[in-house]
Structure formats: structure tokens, C-alpha cells
């Protein structure tokens, strides 16, 4: 894991120890090589689907998809993209809940590679350390930018924040629409999936848990 930030190393190790890491196999393929190979195979796939890649609307599609996969929607598979995290001492002795809600979640279902679209809410009780608020959003985005299962993504965000804050007192909930349900299969356009991960006092204290969940209404 050379070249990774200390925060990225800590989070990756914590997820691996808990069996919560996204299934991945490391390789030595560079970013540009990945794009070239994906573009090549995507060209084959689209050709098999009888699309005319000489058409000016389609000719760049394999390249666009390869770039999108590596640089954007699957960039969270690469821990060198883990956000730079600012964690500081809680010198103000803040002890009340910090909650960030309506965090945009745009991810990809790992079963069908279609969109998961929703909102996340994250809360923690400050102890010895506090984290810059925008860093919470960035951590959510990092774990969303990979093929995902919503249940695991929720747990990954929880463990990442617990690790960085050195505190179990973290809560995460995600409400999302899965396009593998909306646009195919049962084709249910209105259902949402809610997942929640609770740690520390959020799990052990009903009043704290209720305060977190009530604030999301």
C-alpha cells in the first residue's frame, strides 16, 4: 500500500479486518492501461449488440465509458483517490451530536452495473477528535464511487469514520432507489431501500438513536 495516505491505509486495513472491503483483486495495470483495455472490450460488447460504432454518435462511446469507469464512477476502487482528511483535536470540548444529512449518494449496483441514487445521513458524537464537515461528504462519495451493495456501503462509511475519529459513536443511514429494481426486473419505480449502521452509543442508547433518526424527518 505504498503511496497511500495514512488515512487511506488505516481505513482499508480496518475494512479488511472486518470483512467489509469490496471484493477486489490487486493488479499492476496502470490507469491508462485500464482505460485502453476497457475501451477495447467495450467496443467488442457494443459491436456484438449490433451497434454501428462508425456512427458519429457512437464512435467515441467505448472511450467515454472507459474514462467514466476509471476516472469517475469506479474511482473509489483506488485508495490513492481516498480524500485528504482533516481530523483535529476537540479543543472546544464539543459533546453534542454532529449530524450531516441529505448527502447525495450516486453509486452503481455491483450485480447489474446500473445506478443507485439516494441520500445519506451521518452523525457522530465528538470525543477526542472532530472532523471537517466536508470530509464526511467526501468519504460518502468515495465509497459510492465503486460497484456496491447498499448494505456494505453503509457499513464501510461507518467503519471509515469510526477509524478516523477513533470512536465507535457513529451512525449512518442511506435511503436509495435502485435502478436494477426500477428499470429492469420487477420495474418498481417508487420503492426505496433504507439501510442503517449504528455504532457505540447510537446502538446502545435508545434515546441517542431516536435523536439521530428523528432529526432525519
UniProtKB/Swiss-Prot annotation:
Return one GO MF term.
zinc ion binding
Q: Which Pfam families match?
A: GTP_cyclohydroI
Record keywords? GTP-binding, Hydrolase, Metal-binding, Nucleotide-binding, One-carbon metabolism, Zinc
User: Recorded E.C. number(s)?
Assistant: 3.5.4.16
Name the catalysed reactions. Answer: GTP + H2O = 7,8-dihydroneopterin 3'-triphosphate + formate + H(+)
- What PROSITE patterns does the record point to? GTP_CYCLOHYDROL_1_1 (PS00859), GTP_CYCLOHYDROL_1_2 (PS00860)
Q: Name one GO cellular component term.
A: cytoplasm
In this chain, Zn(2+) is annotated as bound at 109, 112, 180
Which is a GO BP term held by this UniProt record? tetrahydrobiopterin biosynthetic process
Cite the annotated pathway. Answer: Cofactor biosynthesis; 7,8-dihydroneopterin triphosphate biosynthesis; 7,8-dihydroneopterin triphosphate from GTP: step 1/1
Query: Is Zinc among the key words of this record?
Result: yes
Matching entries from InterPro entries are given as: GTP-CH-I_C/QueF, GTP-CH-I_N, GTP_CycHdrlase_I, GTP_CycHdrlase_I_CS, GTP_CycHdrlase_I_dom
Family assignment from sequence similarity: Belongs to the GTP cyclohydrolase I family.
The entry describes its oligomerization and partners as: Toroid-shaped homodecamer, composed of two pentamers of five dimers.
Name under which the protein is recorded: GTP cyclohydrolase 1
Recorded source organism is Vibrio parahaemolyticus serotype O3:K6 (strain RIMD 2210633)
Amino acid at each position: 500500500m505504498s503511496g497511500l495516505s495514512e488515512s487511506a491505509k488505516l481505513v482499508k486495513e480496518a475494512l479488511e479486518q472486518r470483512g467489509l472491503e469490496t471484493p477486489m483483486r490487486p493488479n499492476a495495470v496502470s490507469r491508462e492501461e485500464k482505460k485502453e483495455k476497457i475501451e477495447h472490450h467495450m467496443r467488442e460488447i457494443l459491436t456484438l449488440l449490433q451497434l454501428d460504432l462508425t456512427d458519429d454518435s457512437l464512435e467515441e462511446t467505448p472511450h467515454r465509458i472507459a474514462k467514466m469507469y476509471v476516472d469517475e464512477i469506479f474511482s473509489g476502487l483506488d485508495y490513492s483517490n481516498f480524500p485528504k482528511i482533516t481530523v483535529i483535536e476537540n479543543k472546544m470540548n464539543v459533546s453534542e451530536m454532529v449530524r450531516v444529512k441529505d448527502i447525495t449518494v450516486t453509486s452503481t449496483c455491483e450485480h447489474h452495473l446500473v445506478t443507485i441514487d439516494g441520500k445519506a445521513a451521518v452523525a457522530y458524537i465528538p470525543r477526542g477528535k472532530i472532523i471537517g464537515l466536508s470530509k464526511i461528504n467526501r468519504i460518502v462519495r468515495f465509497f459510492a464511487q465503486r460497484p456496491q451493495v447498499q448494505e456494505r456501503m453503509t457499513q464501510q462509511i461507518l467503519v471509515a469514520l469510526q477509524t478516523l475519529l477513533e470512536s465507535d459513536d457513529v451512525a449512518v443511514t442511506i435511503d436509495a432507489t435502485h435502478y436494477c429494481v426500477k428499470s429492469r426486473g420487477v420495474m418498481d419505480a417508487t420503492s426505496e431501500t433504507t439501510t442503517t449502521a449504528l455504532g457505540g452509543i447510537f446502538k446502545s442508547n435508545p434515546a441517542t438513536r431516536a435523536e439521530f433518526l428523528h432529526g432525519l424527518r
